[in-house]
């Protein structure tokens, strides 16, 4: 039995019931191409492998685990790659699932959102605190909340206590479902991300002190007071009106 590696942030799910429940959330159909990120010892893979589908792709960075998966799941496509860099451009209507490593979740999630046009649905297990910040509309929301919710409807499925993992983490996990929105903006994603990061830095600043040509109705507001629709509207309006959106360059 392979031991979890701290360098990869590995915590292996050991409950078959929970694994089955997570896989069922993905709603796999016969014509679906499914990608699993970080299969580990195969808790989710076992159930995915049994389902009728077009193709199952396993993305695993750990070479030791990759070798075991290659022997066990011969009818799956295996990629020994970093999920934060994997290219999805040759696929469409992907369904993606995974227990994301606590120390790599952000880079993986960003890579998936960057390629959202190739994705129809995602189901991810994350640290509970992280998951809650992705679905909140409170003052605790972040730039990643805005970025993810621009392209996906996200809902909280259930929590998973640490005792169901090996080794036992100090935090509780949760499962989120990301359903691709039908109408998404055609923003240039890197520019939009940069805008969001700057907007959410110095978050107590009023917008009139951060943005050039901001409309009066937003001037005295802070980013934490804005809805997602407000944020998208401001970006779309200012990026079309003036490339020099910010009054200065706030630290990221």
UniProtKB/Swiss-Prot annotation:
It is an enzyme of class 2 (transferase). S-adenosyl-L-methionine binds at residues 11, 13, 38, 60, 82, 99. Its EC number is 2.1.1.182. This is Ribosomal RNA small subunit methyltransferase A. SMART domains: rADc (SM00650). It is found in: Cytoplasm. One of its GO terms (molecular function) is RNA binding. Specifically dimethylates two adjacent adenosines (A1518 and A1519) in the loop of a conserved hairpin near the 3'-end of 16S rRNA in the 30S particle. May play a critical role in biogenesis of 30S subunits. Belongs to the class I-like SAM-binding methyltransferase superfamily. rRNA adenine N(6)-methyltransferase family. RsmA subfamily. The keyword NAD does not apply. The gene is rsmA. The lineage of its organism: Bacteria, Pseudomonadati, Aquificota, Aquificia, Aquificales. InterPro entries: KsgA/Erm, rRNA_Ade_diMease-like_C, rRNA_Ade_Mease_Trfase_CS, rRNA_Ade_methylase_Trfase_N, rRNA_adenine_dimethylase, SAM-dependent_MTases_sf. Keywords: Cytoplasm, Methyltransferase, RNA-binding, rRNA processing, S-adenosyl-L-methionine, Transferase. It catalyses: adenosine(1518)/adenosine(1519) in 16S rRNA + 4 S-adenosyl-L-methionine = N(6)-dimethyladenosine(1518)/N(6)-dimethyladenosine(1519) in 16S rRNA + 4 S-adenosyl-L-homocysteine + 4 H(+). One of its GO terms (cellular component) is cytosol. Its main location: cytoplasm. Pfam families: RrnaAD.
């Amino acid at each position: 039995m392979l031991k979890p590696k701290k360098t990869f942030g590995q915590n292996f799910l050991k409950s078959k019931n929970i694994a089955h429940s997570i896989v069922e959330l993905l709603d796999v159909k016969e014509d679906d191409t499914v990608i699993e990120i970080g299969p580990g010892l195969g808790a989710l893979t076992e159930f995915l492998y049994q389902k009728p589908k077009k193709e199952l792709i396993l993305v695993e960075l750990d070479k030791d685990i990759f070798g075991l998966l290659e022997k066990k799941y011969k009818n799956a496509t295996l990629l020994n790659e970093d999920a934060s860099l994997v290219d999805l451009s040759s696929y469409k209507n992907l369904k993606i699932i995974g227990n994301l490593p606590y120390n790599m979740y952000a880079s993986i999630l960003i890579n998936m959102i960057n390629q959202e046009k190739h994705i129809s649905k995602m189901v991810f297990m994350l640290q509970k605190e992280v998951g809650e910040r992705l679905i909140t509309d409170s003052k605790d929301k972040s730039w990643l909340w805005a970025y993810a919710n621009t392209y996906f409807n996200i809902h909280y499925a259930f929590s998973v206590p640490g005792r169901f993992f090996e080794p036992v983490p100090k935090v509780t996990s949760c499962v989120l479902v990301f359903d691709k929105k039908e109408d998404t903006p055609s923003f240039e994603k890197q520019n939009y991300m940069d805008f969001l990061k700057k907007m959410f830095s110095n978050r107590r600043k009023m917008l009139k002190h951060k943005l050039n040509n901001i409309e009066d109705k937003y001037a005295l507001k802070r980013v934490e007071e804005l809805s997602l629709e407000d944020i998208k509207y401001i970006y779309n309006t200012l990026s079309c009106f003036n490339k020099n959106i910010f009054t200065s360059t706030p630290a990221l």
